[in-house]
């Protein structure tokens, strides 16, 4: 009788302990958004590469823990190539400056871009085969780009100015089956760690977990030496031996050694001497004609090509709505939200707002992310509002202004000026208002953790509420209620009246 009773007691204690740990973990997760104050954040860490710069925000900031995201800002010099990488967290990228090309490697998709093959003998054809690869996409300033989790991608700057992009990694996304630690896996090169704070935590836990008794140290020391010989680089291929890679890819061992990149000091952004030669969806004769034209004409041509590509993607989207399913191989992954003609909300005196969500860019449905571009003219106001179903992250692109955020207790958790390069987290349902400065206005992009993020504006709520309710709720006279509901702009973009007009 005693043994079954003890077994049952042990099982009960184990289940109770597990439940307590789960409850504690859930409480900690939910408690991360109990923010008494919010700070404007700037990058905490930088990695300098041969042809660019990578900057990251510390993911341990309470604001970023609340939102469940991490951020990276990359600057790629002209002819700079950001090496192929992937992450378990889906990414949303906004192009702040410059233009370039981007390639993704979707598993199971064909290499639809091929070099034209000239007539030659079979022997010559075997020795020198034409290149082929998956689709290459152009992008430019103002584009929002969606990168699904686990999909390798590379970026190249073919412009004349630095390419600057801000990337959001949704570490709390359901697609990320690991923990909330931001991770970027590089296929090649010898990249430096982009989030050193989380690596230090992992190394500390690893040392604590692998503390061996004295009698077992000799064998473990030998294993560590063998591991160090293999892990000379920081790419995923660095962990495999050259011999194994040579066997796997059926190549020479010298090639396999280069794949491991053990002593490559160029880091994650490398310079391409002479420019990157890739297959474009145009004939060679047309390319030669373009090269013979002036620089300005070449830029006009590229803009026309981008517009044609946008139109083709729109047509494919319409075809999908008509019943022809869009495959992941040809899916539209980018949309420009900075063009004035693209504005969803517009006030000629206050500013404009554009939104990209799963309705305008269907791939965002799988990423569960969306974005908003806001440009406020001088003194323009984005009236008080809140995100109904998402956390949001406001990144200042240009200019300066003031942001005010209020929590559920009516406390002002943020009321400060913001400037170019700063990041402000706005938790779900926290009420926020933005106002541009007097000199150059305010331009910013907002990342949101829902593919169909909805916004509610205080002014809209007032107009949708019966006058008697407002009168009793705020102690207002009927004249004041009428003025509150009917005066001012219908939309959320407001240009304040001058002091003389307000009296």
From Swiss-Prot:
Disulfide bonds join 33-66, 109-329. One of its GO terms (molecular function) is nutrient reservoir activity. The keyword Signal applies. Residues 111-140, 185-235, 253-323 are annotated as: Disordered. It comes from the Eukaryota. Coiled coil: none annotated. Residues 1-22 form the signal peptide. Keywords: Disulfide bond, Seed storage protein, Signal, Storage protein. Residues 301-312 have a biased composition (Acidic residues). Residues 38-257, 335-482 form the Cupin type-1 domain. Residues 254-268, 282-300, 313-323 have a biased composition (Basic and acidic residues). It holds the Pfam family Cupin_1. InterPro entries: 11S_seedstore_CS, 11S_seedstore_pln, Cupin_1, RmlC-like_jellyroll, RmlC_Cupin_sf, Seed_Storage-Functional. SUPFAM superfamilies: RmlC-like cupins. Residues 118-129 have a biased composition (Low complexity). Hexamer; each subunit is composed of an acidic and a basic chain derived from a single precursor and linked by a disulfide bond. This protein found in the seeds of many leguminous and non-leguminous plants is the source of sulfur-containing amino acids in seed meals. Belongs to the 11S seed storage protein (globulins) family. This is Legumin J.
């Amino acid at each position: 009788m005693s043994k079954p009773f003890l077994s049952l007691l042990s099982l009960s204690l184990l289940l109770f302990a597990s439940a307590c740990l789960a409850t504690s973990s859930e409480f900690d997760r939910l408690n991360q958004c109990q923010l008494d104050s919010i700070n404007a954040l700037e990058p905490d860490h930088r990695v300098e590469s041969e042809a660019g710069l990578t900057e990251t925000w510390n993911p341990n900031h309470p604001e970023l823990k609340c939102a469940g995201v991490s951020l990276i800002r990359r600057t790629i010099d002209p002819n700079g190539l950001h090496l192929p990488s992937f992450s378990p967290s889906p990414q949303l990228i906004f192009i702040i400056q410059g233009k370039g090309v981007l390639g993704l490697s979707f598993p199971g998709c064909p290499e639809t871009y091929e070099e034209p093959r000239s007539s030659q003998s079979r022997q010559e054809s075997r020795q020198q085969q034409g290149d082929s690869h998956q689709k290459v996409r152009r992008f430019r300033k103002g584009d929002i780009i969606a990168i699904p989790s686990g999909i390798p991608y590379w970026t190249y700057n073919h412009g004349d100015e630095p390419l600057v992009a801000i990337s959001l990694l949704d570490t709390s996304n359901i697609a990320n089956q690991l923990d909330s630690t931001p991770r970027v896996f590089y296929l090649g090169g010898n990249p430096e760690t982009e989030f050193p704070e989380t690596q230090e935590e992992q190394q500390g836990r690893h040392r604590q977990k692998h503390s061996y008794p004295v009698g077992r140290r000799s064998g473990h020391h030998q294993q560590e030496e063998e591991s160090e010989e293999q892990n000379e680089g920081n790419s995923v291929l660095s962990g495999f031996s050259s011999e194994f890679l040579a066997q796997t890819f059926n190549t020479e061992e010298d090639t396999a050694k280069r794949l491991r990149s053990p002593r490559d000091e160029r880091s994650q952004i490398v310079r391409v001497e002479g420019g990157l030669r890739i297959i474009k969806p145009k004939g060679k004769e047309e390319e030669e004609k373009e090269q013979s034209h002036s620089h300005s004409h070449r830029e006009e041509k590229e803009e026309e090509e981008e517009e044609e590509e946008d139109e083709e993607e729109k047509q494919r989207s319409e075809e999908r709505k008509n019943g022809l399913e869009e495959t992941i191989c040809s899916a539209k992954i980018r949309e420009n939200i900075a063009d004035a003609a693209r504005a969803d909300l517009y006030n000629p005196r206050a500013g404009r707002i554009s939104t990209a969500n799963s309705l305008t860019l269907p791939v965002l449905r799988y990423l569960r992310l969306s974005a908003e571009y806001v440009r406020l003219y001088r003194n323009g106001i984005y009236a008080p509002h809140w995100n109904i179903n998402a956390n949001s992250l406001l990144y200042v692109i240009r200019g300066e202004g003031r942001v005010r955020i209020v929590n559920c207790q009516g406390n002002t958790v943020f009321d400060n000026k913001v400037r170019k390069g700063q990041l402000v987290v706005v938790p779900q349902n926290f009420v926020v208002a933005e106002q541009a400065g007097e000199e150059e206005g305010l331009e910013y992009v907002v990342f949101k953790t829902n593919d169909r993020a909805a916004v509610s504006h205080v002014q809209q709520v007032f107009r949708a509420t019966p006058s008697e309710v407002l009168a009793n709720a705020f102690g207002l006279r009927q004249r004041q209620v009428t003025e509150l509901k009917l005066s001012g702009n219908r939309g959320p973009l407001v240009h304040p009246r001058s002091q003389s007009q307000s009296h």
